[in-house]
Amino acid sequence: GIGQFSHAVRRRLNMLYLVENNGTYGLTKGQASATADPTSKNKKGLSTPFESIDLAAMAIELGAGFVARSFSGDKAQLVPLMKAAIRYRGFALIDVISPCVTFNNPPASTKSYDYVREHNAALDRVDFVAGRAQITADYEAGTTTNVTLHDGSVMALHKLAADYDP
């Protein structure tokens, strides 16, 4: 439940919390869940009177270090996200918009398959980037040092003098 979710995030448990978010409770034959959008309508044409709970925003607010949202119909985006989340050390959330074609698929539902497919817009190309060894630099105040990054590029770091006074 939502209480366990909150505590898992804030305790920074080392886990992937994968949500198949369809905005409905299938066992109750289409009752709106806490993640149902207020503008979304069920099979009977009724809207939920409540604001939806945005699990991704909640996870960020509670301090989760890895938060993503994807669509179950977009394998090219979802697979790299899952790989990255599994490798992440700490709490990772992926909120997967996953339409319930049985109880929450009318045209007015914002979680219907057609609606999500038509409004699915990737914000960026998603790919898995494997972890690398940490790069550190130890240098004196008032000096500059060049640091070579993993891709071979060089970054110049300058440390202000100890007596610097803006």
What does each model-identified segment do?
Residues 1-4, 27-32, 104-109:
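Short acidic, glycine/serine/threonine-rich loops at helix termini
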Residues 64-119:
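ATP/pyrophosphate-binding catalytic subdomain of soluble kinases
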Residues 8, 33-37, 85, 110-113:
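Short, hinge-like loop/turn segments at secondary-structure boundaries
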